[in-house]
Amino acid sequence: MLRLSKFQIGRGAAFLYIENLISMAYGYAFWYILSRITTPDVIGVSSSLISLVTIMVSIASIGIPVGSQRFLGKIFLEGRFEDAKVVVESSLVVVTFGIILCSIVLLIAREWLFGAYQTNLIILALILVAGTTINILLRYIIIASLDTKKILVITIIASGVKLLLTIILVSQIEAESSVIIGFSIAPILSAILFAFSIRSIFKKTQNNSSFKFIGTLRIILSASVVAWIPSLMDTIGSQIGNVMMLGIQGANQAGIYFIAFQIVIGISAIIWALESVAYPILSAMNQGRRLVLWRIIKIGLVIVLPLSVSLIFYSRDIMQIFGQNYTEGSLPLQLLLISVFPTAISAGISILMFAYGNYRDVLVIGLASSIPRIVFYFIFIPSYSGTGAALSFTLGSIIGLVVSLIIGKRFDIILVWKDLVLICCIPLVFAFGLSTFNFHFIPAILISIILSYIVLLRYKIVTREDVQDSMSILPSNIAIPIINTVNKIGSKLNKNY
């Protein structure tokens, strides 16, 4: 099973990884263009509403996407498509009920929750909640099937439509409305295309499942609710900062902070892609889970840390890309980038605990990061604006890391700290050194990343197996030449490579 898992993770993560890169590129292009044709106030209002919608989506989903994925991962691997169909149908029923209930509550409490927004934005927000919730569930189902190539294609289509439509609408109607309409179209279009893809998976299935609808409904709900609470708290802890920025510091400051936050979310998404594919695999495994988790955490950090650490020393240049008004976000960006390392480890341990069925530990890890964040938001945002919000987020990530390590110790989690420290510190040294020489930030960041990988190869912190596993996410005609080239370099740098 371990050998199968490595193949499945590599294959499944291939398209998710590329999809995340494309989503990241589309996202940066989206907010870059908006920053050029609108104002920070428009971005602040739009982004805070999107953050509220994200919280509402987490409530409406009732944790069903993650809860159902735990069962679907094993069912798909065993080829029991009739049973998988029952799980999918049960999940859709629960999520639909959650959307209806959440919409009713939102309409009743609209003055309290959305008092700062116009009526048309509230209506669009409800549509966005429904579309996004269904989209996330269907996306998780396809991830569980490991047929993630479909996600890549659908994301390219939906993201392109969102970007083009929003640019057109900004010049025609109110800027905030155009942003929310664009965000609504993408998940709705994706959900429709995902639905057709899932239908094709079950096209040849018979109605002879061993699962009963009501019984499956209860099992999924029991597994989902325990995952729902920590997931909801994590969502609130990460998203409420932008909402509070709007309420306390105003739309301008909220927009600046949101851009910095999105940059970090885009980088972190690469690790989340690997861990998302790993979850259904880990749930289906009986042995070797801890080793697989360590490999995933290490590979993810090897990919993102050289970049994220380098950006810390050039944060002002990065924020200036979006316009001179956004340079205030350089310090918040630096603080948020620090959170990448602790978040990757704590999220990985949390996924392993959920795969083990230790829901209480998942809840504790989630609360350990989200509750301190919320408390710190109230303390730091009034006095330190975006810097306070970023500091609160990162402090919550560090506390979550500490708690996850305490929990992980009980299960003998495999973490090679020597490798982790070097993966973090080597890019730090190069980026700091280059930043003292007034190089243009683009070549400086590239040089820092290249030198970091050379040293990691030289001292065998990145091994031949790491390279092969990392490149397995790419198509073979691309991966093989890269692997051969890197292996040649590694062999020249270290004879024992």
What feature does the model see in each segment?
Residues 1-9, 176-182, 194-238, 277, ...:
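Interhelical loop/hinge segments that connect adjacent transmembrane helices in multipass membrane
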Residues 2, 435-497:
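Membrane-proximal transmembrane or re-entrant/amphipathic helices at the cytosolic face
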Residues 7-65, 103, 128, 163, ...:
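Signature of the first transmembrane helix
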Residues 11-28, 158, 182-198, 211-280, ...:
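Transmembrane helical elements of multi-pass membrane transporters/channels
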Residues 32, 61-78, 144, 260, ...:
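Helix-loop junctions and terminal segments of transmembrane helices
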Residues 110-125, 251, 311-347:
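Interfacial segments at transmembrane-helix termini and the short loops linking adjacent helices
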Residues 123, 152-202, 367-373, 386-407, ...:
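Hydrophobic alpha-helical transmembrane segments
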Residues 131-154, 284, 337-368, 410:
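Membrane-interface junctions at transmembrane-helix termini in multi-pass inner-membrane proteins
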